[in-house]
Amino acid sequence: MAKKVAGQLKLQVKAGSANPSPPIGPALGQRGINIMEFCKAFNAATQEMEKGMPIPVVITYYQDKSFTFAMKQPPMTYWLKKEAKITSGSKTPGKGAKVGSITKAQVKTIAEAKMKDLNAADIEGAMAMVEGSARAMGLEVVG
């Protein structure tokens, strides 16, 4: 018989850095999920990734207090900041203050990496989403 799902929880955890301190510990603890078991499993699953990369995680927990988790690709802003070599987006995006630039080739690379998490039919649609996010951060798309 299938396990009965008690709920789902969405978190953003840095790769290889899951520990029982806030925000992970309280979020899992109040739902009765074994915190250390999640931390060990998550860190093992992300050991090959760049340490500190933010990973969105969807944790499905069951009534018997067991859980499963699915990892997604890092947020688009992470990839854009990394490609443009900036630390933060513009304080006033769309008002002429550009904080950097990104090429169409870099946009395509990000779109290919994020394709399975995006709601896009093809690579061109995914590239349009990436370009929109870049402009919203104050990045200029060139090339």
Swiss-Prot record:
Question: SMART domains in the record, alphabetically?
Answer: RL11
The transmembrane residues are none
Question: Mind listing the UniProt keywords for this protein, alphabetically?
Answer: Methylation, Ribonucleoprotein, Ribosomal protein, RNA-binding, rRNA-binding
Q: Name one Pfam family in it.
A: Ribosomal_L11
Q: Name one GO cellular component term.
A: cytosolic large ribosomal subunit
Q: InterPro entries, alphabetically? A: Ribosomal_uL11, Ribosomal_uL11_bac-typ, Ribosomal_uL11_C, Ribosomal_uL11_C_sf, Ribosomal_uL11_N, Ribosomal_uL11_N_sf
Q: Which superkingdom does the taxonomy of this entry point to?
A: Bacteria
Molecular-function GO terms, alphabetical:
large ribosomal subunit rRNA binding; structural constituent of ribosome
Q: How is the protein modified post-translationally, according to the record? A: One or more lysine residues are methylated.
* Transmembrane as UniProt keyword: no
Question: Subunit structure, briefly?
Answer: Part of the ribosomal stalk of the 50S ribosomal subunit. Interacts with L10 and the large rRNA to form the base of the stalk. L10 forms an elongated spine to which 2 L12 dimers bind in a sequential fashion forming a pentameric L10(L12)2(L12)2 complex.
* Protein family membership: Belongs to the universal ribosomal protein uL11 family.
What does the protein in this record do? Forms part of the ribosomal stalk which helps the ribosome interact with GTP-bound translation factors.
Supply the name of the protein: Large ribosomal subunit protein uL11
- Gene behind this protein: rplK
